[in-house]
Amino acid sequence: MWTRHRDASWWLMKINLLRGYLLSATQHGNKPPSRHEAESLKRRAHHSPYTCTLTTLTFPENNPLIQTVHGKSV
């Protein structure tokens, strides 16, 4: 079963990958990225600070600061 966090991060990864693909295609004269570029974009999307920030804001239970405030163990 998919959890909220897993489902949201999957969609964000796909959106970031598509955004990177389109950006790369326009920069290279509408040539799709090579396999190496596509893998690089996947890695970058997976470790995107935007994804981490959005996940932390969307799911406060994953935020250590909020867990500390509510007295839960980290």
UniProtKB/Swiss-Prot annotation:
**Which keywords fit this entry according to its UniProt record?**
Plasmid
Region of interest (Disordered), residue spans? 26-45
Q: What is this protein called?
A: Protein sok
User: What organism does this protein naturally occur in?
Assistant: Escherichia coli
Q: Which gene encodes it?
A: sok
